[in-house]
């Protein structure tokens, strides 16, 4: 999912809406394809190296927030990152620190008064566990996030990535909403059951009423701001609910979103029904 700093919105009167990308735009498709290629080219590389490559690609682009959002989705949904080391990094550090303690003080370059330098400590620690100094260096801090290696990457198509991005924008809007009102029209009962199951599974506080004619429903969901005062966990559950709504054929969604710029006025209303046109391939 996208964090709030990556959310792009537009304001029209008292309404605030996500700024969806045009999934048919060649510019956006080229950007998505370029990012996918960067990830694919950095197999077995450290996360820090991959992030540096992404930063170089971003440069002075005015759409850097879109790139960062797309990259986050690739990291979260399509990458497997893990610790790659010949021994657990914690054990390697214990061995290195034990050797360094015996020779304290250890210097970077030996001199007349200090004969043991860092490279000697690393080499001796490696000998104690059958590893070379280079292997010890590689694994010593392999558990830091920036040193996690890209173990596998399952690339989406540029179209799928852009579609997923639009869904993520809508989800990010729900992190800080006060209330969501969903109207669903006539549909297969199985889809309605799936939607209500998602509401219950995510433990969302809600009320349900039937629409006139008995073919549709109106669902009012309490948002994370209404009761929990920006509870991140509840906000995430609210966002996770959205893809289940997208399975329905006829629906509308509006959310009341408090805005710091409108503290003395009414809350803004976020409208989300248009997202269905651009995200069909993601669900």
Named regions from a protein language model:
Residues 1-278:
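Nuclease-adjacent, charged terminal/linker segments that flank catalytic cores
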Residues 281-283:
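C-terminal structured domains
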């Amino acid at each position: 999912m996208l964090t709030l700093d990556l959310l792009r919105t537009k304001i029209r009167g008292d309404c605030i809406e996500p700024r969806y990308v045009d999934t048919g735009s060649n510019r956006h498709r080229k950007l998505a394809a370029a990012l996918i290629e960067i990830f694919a080219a950095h197999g077995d590389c450290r996360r820090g190296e991959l992030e540096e490559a992404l930063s170089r690609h971003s440069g002075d682009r005015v759409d850097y927030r879109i790139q960062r959002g797309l990259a986050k989705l690739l990291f979260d949904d399509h990458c497997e990152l893990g610790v790659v080391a010949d021994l657990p990094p914690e054990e390697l550090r214990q061995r290195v620190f034990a050797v360094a303690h015996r020779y304290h003080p250890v210097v970077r370059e030996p001199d007349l008064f200090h004969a043991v330098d860092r490279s000697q400590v690393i080499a001796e620690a490696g000998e104690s566990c059958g590893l070379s100094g280079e292997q010890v260096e590689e694994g010593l801090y392999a558990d830091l996030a920036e040193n996690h290696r890209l173990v596998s990457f399952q690339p989406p198509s540029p179209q799928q990535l852009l579609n997923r991005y639009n869904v993520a924008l809508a989800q990010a809007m729900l992190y800080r909403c006060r209330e969501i009102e969903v109207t669903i029209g006539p549909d297969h009962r199985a889809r309605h059951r799936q939607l209500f199951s998602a509401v219950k599974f995510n433990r969302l506080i809600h009320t349900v009423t039937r629409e006139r004619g008995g073919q549709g429903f109106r669902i009012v969901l309490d948002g994370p701001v209404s009761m929990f005062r920006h509870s991140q966990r509840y906000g995430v559950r609210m966002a996770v609910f959205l893809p289940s709504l997208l399975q329905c054929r006829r629906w509308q969604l509006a959310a009341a979103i408090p805005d710091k710029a409108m503290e003395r006025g009414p809350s803004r209303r976020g409208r989300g029904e248009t997202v269905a046109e651009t995200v069909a391939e993601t669900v």
